[in-house]
Amino acid sequence: MKAKMDKRKRFLMWSILLIAMVQMPNLALSPSINQINTVVFPDKGLSTIQTVMQIPNLISPFITITMAWLISRGLVTKRVSIIGGLFLVAATGALALIFNTQFWHLILLSCCLGLGLSGYISTASSLIVDNFNEGERQMISGFQTSFINGGGIIMSLCGGLLGTLMWYGGYMMLLLALPVAIIALFAIPKIPRQRKTEDGKNIGSARLHSDVFMYGAFIFVFMLVYNVIGSNLSTHLSGMGNSAVSGYATAIQMCGGVVCGLFFGRLSRRIGDYTTVLSFLVIFIGMTLLSLFPNSMAVTCVAVFIAGMGMSLMLPQCMFSVSKVVTPRTSALATSITSCICPSFGGFFSAMVFTNITTKLFGPSTVMRYRFVSFVALACAVIVFAIVTYRKNRKKEEIPAA
């Protein structure tokens, strides 16, 4: 597939994959959550710290939808949005060197990070829809998730190590966005702001297909569950070492995503949307192991590796399925919903929902939190299986009628 691409498309593909590597900078920060909670700001509760760290997930949807609207109106190009976002993320890393002593500094950094991420996460994904054919999109979607997880490994490992030196050390990893922005300057074509037909009208319908919202709902619920793993690892492993240990565990979690992403294309061609069901099942298995063997680092590594595979099953499948029902006119908005708005809201509300619910039911135990959410993931797998099967059977019934 890659051999059929011309040089321009290959350069663009690699640029998109490099952008994917700086798509999860929060993983560079999560290893320090326990240190921030117990040492830096001990007067703040764990839920409060987790929520502030998830502010980017609250800001991103609103800024992303605004950028998608501006892009669809031809007021801003995708190139400007992506490059501007990358530079802002890099600037956030530099700001952390100055603003790192007050609690409002933590809020400020989270807001700046959210603004930067809003510029490129979904917009970069829409470049895949606009510039590649269906076979190429299926392949690149899997590779993109592998690079997201690969970047997450680098972020979590280095962020955990830097976090042992200073609580804001993880923010230094955001500076990696700077060289990526420079590469994007040359790789992303200066395409017309809005492609037109010969009679001057916009290409395609302006209405979003209903499937976009269904896959967006899948992603929202998935991230609501998936984020419980990373946001609680630091606390769960606090008895086994410092933030570096949490960083290693997070890196192993991302390894699961990398490995699974490499095989996503083949798996997707065989089972289609059932990969979304599988994503919830691996979360169930991983969290169950975490809750059953809380004192075993070896089992913890296996558990997070298995759970990490979930992201490389859910996200690329939903993105690929959405790419088949969008038009050039709706690609920016559709990818904003599925790659930023829904996962961001899921990530933001994750701590608010599950940390608060499980704390009231079982106390601060992360063991019981993982156990509770594992059964939520299992229930989600059953529901999604029913939805996918129903849709598949309905399509079979519609074929003869057509």
Predicted regions and their residues:
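Conserved MFS/SLC helix-loop-helix module at the cytosolic interface between two early adjacent transmembrane helices
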Residues: 62-103
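Symmetry-related core transmembrane helices of the 12-TM Major Facilitator Superfamily/SLC fold
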Residues: 170-186, 369-387
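Cytoplasmic helix-loop-helix junction between adjacent transmembrane helices
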Residues: 109-147
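Extracytoplasmic gate region of multi-pass secondary transporters
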Residues: 30, 211-258
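Intracellular juxtamembrane helix-capping segments at the cytosolic ends
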Residues: 119-132, 313-327
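Helix-loop-helix hairpin linking two adjacent transmembrane segments in secondary transporters
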Residues: 143-189
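A late C-terminal transmembrane helix in Major Facilitator Superfamily
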Residues: 323-363
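Helix-to-loop junctions at the C-terminal end of transmembrane segments
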Residues: 62-77, 260-272, 358
